[in-house]
């Protein structure tokens, strides 16, 4: 109680004020907050001595400001706000900044304008509401996770390597949340089960801002290998040429490689099964607009092509399987210019029919210098052949996206060990059928070899010695009997295989519970990394006119700026961020131009009225 009294005296509270019935029992923004009947909220309230309403944080019931206010005045001591959170009177600690020099990693604040335009904070507020009374509320937790991704702190455990006080100064807090706190916040969000809704809301925001760049959408699966002890469905990993326990995610990216949304496949379903639900979500995002979807050979299915066309989409994909090679004389040089770069291809353009002639498509085949032919199928008749080839080969940007997120953002990291029940009636390949089928294939191969040997003996038979077939059979009687035995074994194995179902419910194959990895927390962290990557991409686009090597070094430049130290200067209405110069003068000049563009956005720090003003010190 003595500590409480000291805190109250420091805040300037009086016994009269403490006796008022208007003491807030719930935050005004809480969805179920109500005033007692017959009582109107008072407009009077106490503000900490010297506290600036534009800086931060706590709002009483009668507060009229658009941002809550804090009872703390010292940015390094937020004990009053922590006390209010403990008493259940605070949903989220508002940012409170102090002037500081060379704050480590404060350059990450450059990302706030583009994070703000992504709508991530508004979407989170709409979908999740709040996390209840807390010092680290929804906004603070979400901002921490986003900045961690941009700092390349790939897991909550990585926070152990950084000073909470230093990270807190960037967040406008006395301390950043630590590992257990952040895990608990993620668990709270995952318990809501709304990651899919959150992802849809973010995708709607992205479409609203960049709809013109979404005429071509690239769909591809990404396999996350599982190394734990749970028995999970297997997926084929192309790099390993093996089927291993894993989880498959299907990402949809735009033509620049930036992600739009992600879906997790049930039991590692293939592209043919996953494309219909993916296109259903694309239709919900894009409306009736006709979109071209681009995917690899995993989605090759003429019947699926019909479904895609009936759903009002166009498509591009590689042709799978055998096809008639095209003679050299049918190939011609085609050129196209995209984003200022000229692309040249040797192409043959022709019409093909699938499904016994019912499906007519266009095939554009590329010929490489080594003679390899790559056929591309599409229904688009309006595009030049070179454009079709370029759009198809542009898939490499999505592959680079997977590689970049895996290395820089730990896309494949296991977020939690928890498992949830899976469908026990889900059908899987029957291992008994597979074992018999393997024996049958071996037996059939053995029979084929014996028959080939018998045929060779017949072909080389000397007629002078054995002029009749009867004589040949007698001479080859031992080989003939071996062939009959092998034939009978093949027939027996075929009967055994036909008596066994090819697929069975998964529950019949194991006595252990049928489970899968808990998807919610992983989906949520994927969305956070997706938004961080989008913000990084937006910054690269903004700096592109001012940096010649943006294609090769754009992301490296932005990453260096986000990781740099900065001076913080606070006024009544502004937070000035002055970055330290970068490694060279031309890189510093590029970031200076970026700062000028960001200043035009008039962005406010999330949760406060402070407008952000950026600058960078010139190289000495």
Where are each of the predicted segments found?
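Short, solvent-exposed alpha-helical "recognition" segments
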Residues: 5-19, 189-193
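Charged, amphipathic alpha-helical linkers/stalks
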Residues: 404-460
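Dynamic "connector" segments at or just before major functional cores
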Residues: 21-243, 248-268, 276-280, 284-285, ...
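Extended alpha-helical coiled-coil "stalk/arm" regions
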Residues: 450-497, 501-504
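Key DNA-contacting residues within the recognition helix of helix-turn-helix
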Residues: 2-5, 183
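Acidic, metal-coordinating catalytic cores used for nucleic-acid/nucleotide bond scission
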Residues: 293-303, 321-324
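An anionic, glycine-rich sequence signature occurring as long contiguous blocks
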Residues: 80-86, 306, 310-401, 406, ...
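C-terminal, active-site-flanking charged/polar segments
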Residues: 314, 332, 384, 392-428, ...
């Amino acid at each position: 109680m003595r500590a409480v009294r000291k805190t109250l005296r420091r805040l300037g509270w009086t016994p009269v004020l403490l006796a008022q019935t208007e003491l807030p029992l719930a935050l005004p923004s809480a969805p179920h907050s109500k005033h007692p009947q017959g009582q109107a909220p008072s407009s009077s309230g106490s503000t900490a001595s010297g506290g600036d309403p534009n800086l931060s944080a706590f709002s009483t019931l009668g507060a009229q400001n658009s941002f809550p206010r804090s009872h703390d005045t010292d940015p390094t001591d937020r004990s009053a706000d922590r006390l209010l959170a403990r008493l259940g009177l605070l949903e989220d600690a508002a940012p409170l900044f102090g002037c500081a020099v060379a704050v480590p990693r404060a350059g990450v604040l450059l990302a706030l304008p583009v994070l703000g335009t992504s709508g991530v904070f508004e979407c989170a507020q709409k979908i999740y509401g709040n996390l209840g009374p807390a010092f680290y509320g929804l906004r603070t937790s979400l901002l921490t996770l986003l900045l961690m991704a941009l700092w390349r702190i790939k897991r909550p455990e990585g926070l152990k390597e950084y000073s909470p006080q230093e990270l807190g100064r960037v967040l406008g807090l006395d301390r950043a949340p630590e590992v257990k706190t952040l895990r608990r916040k993620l668990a709270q969000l995952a318990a809501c089960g709304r990651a899919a809704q959150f992802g849809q809301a973010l995708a709607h925001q992205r479409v609203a801002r960049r709809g013109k760049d979404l005429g071509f959408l690239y769909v591809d699966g990404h396999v996350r290998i599982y190394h734990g002890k749970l028995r999970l469905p297997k997926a084929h990993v192309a790099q390993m040429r093996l089927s291993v326990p894993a989880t498959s995610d299907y990402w949809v990216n735009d033509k620049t490689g930036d992600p739009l949304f992600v879906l997790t496949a049930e039991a590692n379903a293939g592209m043919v099964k996953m494309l219909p639900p993916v296109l259903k979500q694309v239709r919900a995002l894009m409306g009736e607009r006709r979109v071209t979807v681009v995917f690899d050979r995993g989605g090759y299915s003429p019947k699926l092509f019909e479904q895609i066309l009936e759903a009002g989409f166009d498509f591009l994909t590689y042709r799978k399987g055998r096809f008639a090679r095209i003679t050299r004389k049918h190939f011609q040089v085609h050129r196209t210019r995209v984003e200022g770069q000229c692309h040249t291809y040797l192409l043959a353009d022709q019409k093909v029919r699938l499904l016994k002639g019912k499906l007519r498509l266009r095939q554009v085949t590329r010929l490489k210098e080594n003679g390899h032919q790559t056929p591309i199928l599409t229904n688009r008749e309006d595009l030049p052949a070179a454009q079709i080839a370029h759009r198809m080969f542009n898939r490499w940007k999505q592959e680079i996206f997977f590689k970049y997120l895996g290395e820089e953002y730990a896309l494949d990291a296991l977020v939690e060990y928890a498992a949830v029940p899976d469908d026990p009636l889900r059908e899987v390949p029957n291992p008994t059928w597979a074992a018999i089928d393997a024996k049958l294939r071996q037996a059939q191969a053995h029979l084929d070899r014996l028959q080939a040997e018998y045929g060779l003996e017949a072909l080389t038979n000397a007629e002078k010695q054995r002029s009749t077939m009867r004589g040949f059979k007698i001479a080859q009687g031992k080989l003939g009997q071996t062939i009959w035995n092998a034939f009978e074994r093949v027939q027996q194995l075929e009967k055994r295989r036909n008596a066994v179902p090819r697929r069975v419910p998964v529950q019949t194959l194991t006595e252990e519970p049928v489970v899968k990895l808990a998807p919610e927390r992983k989906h949520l962290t994927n969305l956070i990394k997706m938004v961080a990557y989008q913000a990084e991409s937006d910054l690269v686009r903004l700096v592109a006119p001012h940096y010649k090597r943006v294609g090769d070094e754009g992301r490296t430049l932005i990453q260096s700026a986000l990781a740099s130290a900065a001076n913080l200067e606070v006024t009544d209405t502004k937070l000035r961020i002055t970055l330290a110069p970068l490694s060279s003068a031309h890189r510093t000049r590029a970031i200076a131009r970026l700062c000028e563009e960001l200043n035009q956005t008039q962005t406010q720090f999330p949760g406060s009225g402070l407008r952000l003003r950026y600058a960078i010190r010139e190289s000495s």
